[in-house]
Regions:
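N-terminal accessory segment detector
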Residues: 1-75, 81-98, 115-116, 121-160
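Active-site helix/loop of acyl-thioester processing domains in fatty-acid/polyketide metabolism
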Residues: 96-112
Length: 160
């Protein structure tokens, strides 16, 4: 059983998602100090930052995480082996709520401003990988709306 399962039993599925996302966000803000804040990150190339971020997660057993494609309105991070996902459960929804919050908190911390994150692919629901879109709150909100309306991910990203 997972922490999400136990929280869902006690508080309900939506409350569990919110609690995990919030806890992840706070943990991510704290973890952002590992990167030395905006001054240190500002001096890194994009390639160096993404390598550092990927190494941060893999050293801690979270799995591999790397940018996917060229960022336009939103960026994408992907992992074929993300630890929060459980491909055996067949969840109809994306389930990496803690990770989504953590990534948002960490990116907000290092960017020095708001960065929204949305899980757009999840191994727990049968996708080949976990994918996290990140960007401005407006861009992520627009992406979410398109996905809810049934637009596939590639088309939704192209429309932004």
């Amino acid at each position: 059983t997972t922490l999400r399962d136990e929280l869902s039993k006690e508080a309900g599925p939506l409350a569990a998602i919110h609690a995990l996302h919030h806890a992840g966000y706070e943990a991510g803000v704290t973890a952002g100090t590992t990167f030395g804040g905006t001054d240190q990150v500002g001096g890194m190339s994009q390639a160096a930052f993404w390598k550092e971020l990927g190494d941060f997660f893999s050293r801690r057993g979270w799995g591999t995480l790397a940018p996917d494609g060229e960022a336009q309105s939103v960026g994408l991070l992907a992992s074929p082996d993300w630890v929060e996902a459980d491909p055996t459960i067949g969840d109809p929804e994306a389930s990496c709520s803690f990770s989504t919050g953590f990534l948002s908190g960490l990116m907000c911390s290092v960017a020095g401003g708001p960065v929204a994150v949305l899980e757009v692919e999840c191994r727990s629901r049968g996708d080949a990988r976990c994918g996290f879109a990140f960007g401005s709150e407006a861009s992520i909100h627009s992406l979410y709306g398109q996905l809810v309306d049934g637009t596939d991910l590639d088309a939704a990203l192209s429309a932004l």
